[in-house]
């Protein structure tokens, strides 16, 4: 139940060593840079006494790298979209030093400029193409007009060109037929419009204009100096030129796909550098030296010192170590969990709820064995467990996984074992019952039948819940005793243990072994414990009646324990439900004709069992966590710690480890 002990490490070194030291501690990913000033008042007070000291101001460099990062991310997105198939890189492991050796800022800037130019050129071509497509569409409709639309100068007539909606065509032509002095010719008809040329006398201009407006006649806006057919050919030629330019640019762009991994590594480096630049803002700087304060886990101290001394000789750096003050423990100190490799994957359950405070017990080791049992009991299938085991091993051995995903793989790898064990106990293999004789030997499985031993499984679920509640209360009692809150430890822990054990003895003595002595002992123990719960608040309170009321109300909490125990019946319900569903899927396929059973049936079994595995794992994960958070943690755990936040890399594309 370990929370890492923290020390405050202060570093004083020459200003030129700052970058190397920050890179060294970032590569370790186990050092949190501490904010020296918690308020502007503290900063001002120090400056007033030591005017040569000032907080590091690295915003200019920070802005530079943030701008470069934004440009790079935009172009990575542009490259990915342009590839049409999505670009990816294989995840690898680097040290921070190896990673930063792949980075060349000058070369990157050159690539960024070239790619930006290609991107802008492609955008401009796209815009020009859209314009030409619109022009081509317009000119294609008028290409059979063999005169320049805007250059007809007639002495006594006007010539107009334009279009009307096809729905108005019949009535428009009928109206024009009433004007024998108006000549009209249809040039083209599209799906929705008809295109006309009209010639009419100047003295009829007003009447014809009114007619055209009545039918929403849209005049042609022509901007070319050549006839439409010639202009149409010119537009097509320009369009072909743009297509060739676009093809050449895309070929040039495709050549940059080979540099995708380089760009991804550059982004990783920029993310790391930005993290360091942000950390620099917490430093104190003089003209020739700097001061850096950090939180470090005590167990990592030797490794941290070694890494720093690799960058800076001992005689060129001053290091001091201090234990956290009481005020820092209450307000500032981070919390890092320290457990063995078997328990570490289960830390994520604690983190999802809340980290413990610095001086509080870590509930993860106490919670882990119960979660193992509960998860296995709720999934309880040999086949499902073997599948979990196989997939977890493949994921861990065949791939370099992101840390979060690796922790999940470790988590399900461990959980596969109780799933297999409970599968044997229930005698279930992908929902099918184990044969009574295996390899010529009579099988002892199932130990418990999900059809015949439902009540036994139900009682077993409640017993497991009872044990977990007892463990939670014992942890609470020990914590309160260590804090010398002895009356509270009795009232909030040991008395409730007495009630639980007393009630257990009552049940066993009355219903199981039929022993009056056990029954009487249980009644006495439960009664004395109940009296303690009522009396202790009276002792602690100056107002005795108020204390009595508080004690009686506290005793009412026994109903909550009944509810807690009932909650554990879900272990039985989910385990039996998952097995029954799997068995039903098998029966469904068995009813199929032989031909369908060994063709469609196999595919159907795979799909249905995949669905049941997903639902079983999800249900066990959620309900298992719920039992820990509500029933178990509620007995002793407060939480509220601040997570340890070391200076590290983002690890977006690679894993960074100290080599």
What residue ranges belong to the model's regions?
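Conserved, carboxylate-rich catalytic/transport cores that coordinate ions
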Residues: 2-7, 14-22, 26-33, 293, ...
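Long, charged N-terminal accessory/stalk domains
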Residues: 1-367, 395, 402-405, 409
């Amino acid at each position: 139940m370990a929370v890492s002990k923290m020390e405050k490490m202060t570093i004083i070194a020459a200003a030129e060593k700052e970058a190397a030291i920050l890179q060294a501690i970032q590569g370790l990913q186990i050092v949190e840079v501490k904010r020296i000033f918690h308020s502007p008042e503290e900063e001002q007070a120090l400056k007033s006494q030591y005017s040569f000291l000032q907080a590091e101001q690295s915003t200019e460099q920070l802005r530079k790298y943030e701008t470069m990062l934004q440009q790079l991310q935009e172009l990575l997105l542009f490259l990915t979209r342009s590839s049409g198939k999505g670009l990816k890189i294989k995840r690898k492991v680097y040290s921070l030093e190896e990673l930063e050796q792949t980075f060349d800022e000058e070369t990157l800037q050159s690539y960024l400029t070239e790619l930006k130019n290609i991107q802008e050129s492609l955008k401009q071509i796209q815009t020009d193409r859209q314009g030409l497509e619109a022009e081509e569409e317009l000119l294609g409709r008028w290409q059979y007009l063999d005169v320049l639309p805007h250059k007809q100068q007639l002495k006594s007539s006007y010539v107009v060109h334009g279009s009307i909606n096809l729905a108005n065509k019949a009535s428009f032509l009928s109206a024009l037929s009433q004007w024998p002095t108006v000549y009209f010719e249809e040039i083209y008809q599209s799906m929705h419009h008809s295109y006309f040329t009209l010639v009419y006398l100047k003295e009829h201009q007003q009447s014809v204009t009114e007619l055209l407006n009545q039918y929403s006649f849209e005049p042609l806006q022509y901007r070319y100096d050549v006839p439409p057919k010639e202009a149409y050919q010119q537009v097509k030629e320009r369009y072909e030129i743009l297509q060739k330019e676009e093809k050449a640019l895309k070929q040039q762009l495709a050549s940059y796909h080979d540099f995708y991994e380089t760009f991804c590594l550059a982004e990783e480096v920029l993310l790391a550098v930005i993290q360091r630049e942000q950390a620099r803002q917490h430093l104190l700087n003089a003209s020739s030296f700097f001061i850096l304060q950090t939180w470090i886990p005590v167990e990592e101290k030797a490794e941290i010192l070694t890494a720093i001394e690799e960058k800076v000789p001992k005689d060129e750096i001053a290091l001091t170590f201090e234990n956290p003050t009481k005020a820092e423990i209450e307000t500032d100190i981070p919390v890092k969990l320290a457990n063995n490799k078997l328990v570490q994957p289960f830390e994520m359950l604690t983190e999802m709820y809340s980290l413990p405070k610095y001086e509080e017990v870590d509930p993860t080791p106490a919670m882990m064995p119960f979660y193992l049992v509960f998860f296995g009991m709720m999934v309880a299938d040999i086949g499902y467990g073997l599948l979990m085991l196989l997939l977890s091993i493949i994921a861990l051995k065949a791939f370099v996984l992101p840390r979060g995903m690796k922790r999940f793989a470790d988590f399900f790898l461990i959980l596969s074992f109780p799933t297999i064990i409970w599968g044997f106990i229930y005698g279930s293999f992908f929902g099918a019952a184990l044969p009574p004789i295996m390899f010529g030997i009579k099988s002892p499985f199932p130990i418990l039948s999900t059809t015949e031993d439902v009540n036994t499984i139900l009682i077993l679920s409640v017993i497991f819940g009872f044990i977990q509640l007892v463990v939670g209360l014992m942890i609470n009692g020990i914590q309160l005793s260590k804090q010398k809150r002895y009356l509270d430890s009795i009232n909030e822990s040991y008395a409730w243990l007495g009630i639980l054990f007393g009630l257990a003895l009552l049940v066993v003595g009355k219903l199981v072994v039929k022993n009056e002595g056990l029954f009487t002992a249980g009644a006495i123990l439960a009664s004395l414990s109940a009296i303690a719960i009522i009396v202790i608040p009276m002792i602690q309170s100056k107002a005795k009646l108020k204390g009595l009321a508080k004690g009686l109300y506290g005793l009412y909490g026994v109903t909550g324990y009944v509810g807690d125990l009932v909650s554990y019946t879900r272990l039985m319900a989910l385990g039996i439900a998952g097995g029954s569903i799997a068995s039903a899927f098998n029966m469904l396929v068995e009813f199929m004709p032989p031909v369908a059973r060994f063709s469609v049936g196999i595919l159907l079994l795979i799909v249905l069992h995949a669905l049941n595995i997903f639902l079983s794992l999800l249900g066990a994960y959620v309900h298992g966590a719920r039992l820990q958070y509500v029933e178990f943690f509620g007995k002793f755990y407060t939480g509220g710690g601040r997570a340890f936040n070391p200076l590290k890399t983002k690890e977006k594309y690679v894993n960074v480890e100290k080599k």
